[in-house]
Amino acid sequence: MEGRSDFVATSQSGSEMSHSETRNRTGMNARKRKFACVECRQQKSKCDAHERAPEPCTKCAKKNVPCILKRDFRRTYKRARNEAIEKRFKELTRTLTNLTSDEILKKIEEEQEIVLDNSNFTKEKVKQLRKSAFETTEIEPRSYKTLRGEPISYSTNRRHTDSSPLTLLSSSTNFDPVHSTNVMTDDQLKCLPKSLGDVYLSSSDIAELFQEFATKYHQFLPVVDLSKGAERIYHLSPCLFWVILLIGLRRKFGATDLMTRLSVLVKSVLSEITISPIIRYTPSDKDEPVLNVASVYSVQAFLLYTFWPPLTSSLSADTSWNTIGTAMFQALRVGLNCAGFSKEYASANSELVNEQIRTWICCNVVSQTVASSFGFPAYVSFDYLVISSIRVPNSKSQVDIPNELRQMAQIARFENQIVNTMNSTPASVTGMVSQEEKQPLLHVLNQQLSQLEISLEENNLDDIRKFLLLVAKVHLLTYYFTDVTSQSAGKSNGNIYEGSYSIMELDTSFETKRGLVKVYNAAVNFLIHANSMWEHDPTIIKYFPGLFVLNIWQSACIISKLIHSSLHSMLDVNSGKKAYNNAISLTFNASVLKYDMAYRSSGIMRSIWSLFANMYDAWKNDQKEGGGRLNNDFNLGITIKSRMSVNVFFDCLYILKEKCGMAKLERETKVSTAYNVDEEEEEDEDEEGEEEEEEEELSSKVPENMDSQQLRTRKFTNVRHPEKKARKIIETIPLDPNPINAGSTSSGSSLTTPNSQVANTISYRGILNKMSPREQLNHANLDSSVSTDIKDTEAVNEPLPIGRNAEHPANQPPLSITQMQENTLPATQANSSLLETYPIVQSNPVTTTIKESPNSIMAGWDNWESDMVWRDVDILMNEFAFNPKV
C-alpha cells in the first residue's frame, strides 16, 4: 500500500510538473510568435524581424527602408479594392434613385463584375495608383481646382480598358496639361519612315509629332484610339495618320514651311475621299494602305481636321462647316449610326463596333459645336445609340466611351435642345418663337441647364468640358437680345446704325433687361474661366481648337456691346473690362501665324471696343443736349437675327462694317484694280508713325498711381481711329484661298488648290509607292548615264525653287524637324515676339508652275532678267532641238 501511495504521489507530482512545463512552453511560444514587417508583408517575402529585433530585418536593412511591425497591416491592393467598393457603394446610393428597376439590376451586375475582378487590382495598376496619388499631392497647391476652392479627389468610378483612348489616370478631377497622362509608349510610337508627295518624315519625327498630338491635342477631342500605335494607324487609314501629323506640326518651331506643304497634300487627300471614295465597312490593318478609303478612321480624320482646320484669315474661308458636313454624311455612308444592331455589319468585331459607336457620338458632338458657333442649323442625330451611351455609362451592349466624351455629348444635346426650342416656328421669318412664349421657355431651359451643370460637376467635370458648358450658357441667354425691337424703330444716321430705342417700344422691358444682365455676367464668367485655364497652364491656349477661340471672341463682343449701352450703370464694368482685355490677350496668344483668324480677331476686338465707346459717348452727349431726360435705351437691340445664338456677334461685325464704310470701299476697289506700291508703303510708314505717336501720347498721360494691368487695359481699349484701324485689319487676309482664274489653265493642265504650293495633281498610287529622298538620291546616282538633252528637258519641265540651285529638294537628304529647328533658330532669335517670328511674306510660292495667270505674267514681263522670260526661251529652244547650254 505504501508503495502504491508513493507511486500515486510520484505520478501526481510528475503530472503537475508536466502541466507547468506545458504552460511555460505555451507562454514562451506565445511570446515568440513571429510577425513579419510591413515591407515583407507587402512583398510576400520571408522576414527575420523576430530574430533580429530590435534591429531591422535583413531585407529592410538591405533596402535601407524603415522596418515597421504592425499587427493589423493589410496589403495595399486589398485596401485599394475595399476603398473602391466603398466609393462605388456611395455612388450607387446617390445615383440609383433616378434609375428604373431594369437599369438598377443591370448596373448592379456590372458593378459586381468590376469589383470581383481581381485583374482590376494588379500590381501594375497599384503602382500607377500610388504614383497618381503622389503626383496629386505634389501638384495640389497649384491646381486650378484650388483656385475655385474645391478639393482634389481621385475617382475610380470609371472602367478603364486597354482599348480606351484615355489612360488610367486621365479620369482625375483636374485637367492638368502639365502632368498630362495621355502619353504614348515607345512601342506605340514605333513607326517606319513615311512620305507623302514631297514631304518625308523620319521615325523620330513621327514619334515626336504623335507624342505632341497625344499630350496636347487629344484631350480636347478623345476620338482616336492612340493605343493602336502610329504604325497600325497608318495601315488602318493613311489619311488619319497624316492628319494627326499635320495637327502635331501646328506649334512645332521651325516647321511652318513643312506644315504648309503637308497641309496642301492632306487637303487633296481629303477632297479625293469626298469625291471618289473606296468604301470599307470593316477596315483591317492587314489591308493595303490606300489614301482614298472611306471608313470609320477617315471619319475620325475629318473630325480632327474640323477641330483644327487649316489656317485662314477670315471666317468666310473657314472650312469647319464644310468638313463636318462631309464627316456626318460619310459616317452615315459607312454605317456608323447603326453599327451596334444592324445585321449588315454583324461581321464586325467588338473592337471595331466600339470604334464606330465612339466615332458616331463624336460626329454629333462636333457637328453641334460647329453649328452653334457659326449660327447655322445643325445636322445631328441624337438617336438611341447616342442617348443610351450618355445615360448608361457601363452598359454591356455599348462601348465604354471616355467620361470626357460623354459629358461633351450631354452638353451638345442641350445646345441642340436650345435651337429646337427657340427656333421652332416655321410661320416666323426667323423661326423664332413668339414673344409670349419666349420668356417661359428661357426659364425652363435655364433650369435644365442648372440641373445639367450639377450632374456634370458630380461626375468630375474638368476645365475643358466646363469651358463648353459655359459657352452653352452664353448661347442660351443670348436669346434675350432678340426681344428688343428692330433697328427701324430706332434712330439711324444714313447707313450707320445707332441702335436707340424708346422704353415704350420694348416688349418686355424688365425681363429683357434682367436677361441681358444675366448674359453679361455669363460672358464675364466664361472669359474668367478661360483666363484661369491660361494662368494655370500658359501653353494650353496655343493648342485651342479654332472653335474655342471663336467662342472667346463672341463672348467678348457681348461684353463690349452691353458696357457701352444704356445698361452701363447696372453692370460690373470693371470686371467686364478686365475680362475683355483678357480675351484680347487670349486670342492673340492663340495665333499660330501672323494675320490668321486668332491674330486678326484680337485687333478687331480693340476696334470694336473703341467704336462702341465713341457711339456711347455720342449718345450721352445727345441726352445731355436734350435736357438730361434719358428716355431712350441705347445699344440693346440687334439687326442680325438669322444666326440664332450668335446673333450678337455677327451684329457687332455688321455695325463695324457699316461704320468703316466697307460697302463703299468694296465698290471703289472694283472700279480701281491697280495701285501704287510706293504710295502704299508711304501710307504704312505714316500709320506706323501715328501708332508710335499715339502710344507716346497715352504713356505721357498715365497717372503715377496706375499699375501695369490698368496701363495695358488703357492701351487695348484706346484706339484713335477705330474705323480706319478696323478697315486695315479687314483688308488684310493673306491666308485666305487665292482665286483661281478660270481662263488661266488649259484642258490638259493641272489646277493647284487655293493657297497652294504644289503644282502637280497628286497621284495617290504614286504617293504610296514613292521612294524616300535617300532612295531617290541613290537611284539618281545610278542613272547618271542618261543623255544630256533628256536631262535638260527634265530640268526645264521641273519647277525651280526660288533663290536656290536647280537641284530638286527631293534629291537632297531629308532634314528632320530638329535639324530644321536648328537652322531656323539663328534667324529667329533676334525677333522673339509673335509678330516677328512668323512674318507674312506675300511672295511667290516655293515652286512656280508653268501655267501662270495673265496678270502674273504681265507683272514681270518688262523684267528681262526674270526667270519667266528665259524659261520660255529655253522651252522654245528645246522644241527646235537646240541645246541652250552649248
Curated annotation (Swiss-Prot):
What would be one Gene Ontology cellular-component term for the protein? nucleus
Upper classification of the organism: Eukaryota, Fungi, Dikarya, Ascomycota, Saccharomycotina
Protein task = Factor for control of RNA levels of a group of leucine-specific genes.
Task: Name a biological process GO annotation.
Answer: positive regulation of L-leucine biosynthetic process
Keywords, A to Z?
Activator, Amino-acid biosynthesis, Branched-chain amino acid biosynthesis, DNA-binding, Leucine biosynthesis, Metal-binding, Nucleus, Transcription, Transcription regulation, Zinc
Location in the cell reads: Nucleus
Q: What is the scientific name of the source organism?
A: Saccharomyces cerevisiae (strain ATCC 204508 / S288c)
Q: Where does the record place the region Disordered? A: 1-28, 673-709, 734-756
Q: Which PANTHER family match?
A: FINGER DOMAIN PROTEIN, PUTATIVE-RELATED (PTHR31845), REGULATORY PROTEIN LEU3 (PTHR31845:SF21)
Protein name in UniProt: Regulatory protein LEU3
- Miscellaneous information on this protein: Present with 125 molecules/cell in log phase SD medium.
User: What residue spans carry the Low complexity bias annotation?
Assistant: 743-753
Pfam hit, one: Zn_clus
